[in-house]
Amino acid sequence: MCLTRFLACLGPTEVVKVAGVLLAAGSGSRFAGPSHKLLAGIGGEAVVTHAARSMVNSGLSGYLLVAGATELSSALTEFSELVIVENPESEHGIATTLSVAVDWGEAAGFDALIVGLADQPGVLSSSWRRFSNSYAPIAVSNYDG
């Protein structure tokens, strides 16, 4: 597989088909709450619901959530445009989850993927949009730094 197909570096005059991806396949083993961390409540909604809403409201061309260790679909019913794919090898680490996302992106004809983590509910839709307009082969976010 050629990963260069996913580089969003075509420049501002090119139309690039960009998908947002939330990685949500981990076991959340360090979280001490009564449920999986992605199902923990913030303001009456699951963490994963907040993260998915932000991504889906960003205006990208497509949206994927890669699940694995726990059932998340009940927290995502409002997002008809969100594709949910299971990573059957999630216990082998985040690289396998990213590989599932890249395979999906390639099969669906996307030019670039913006990858986020489903346990980061504070990422804004505007942040997803900014990344889609970066025209850089690799873009990394930072906070207060």
Over which residues does each language-model region extend?
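N-proximal low-complexity "stem/linker" segments adjacent to membrane-targeting elements
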Residues: 2, 6-21, 28
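Nucleotide and nucleotide-moiety/phosphate-recognizing core
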Residues: 17-145
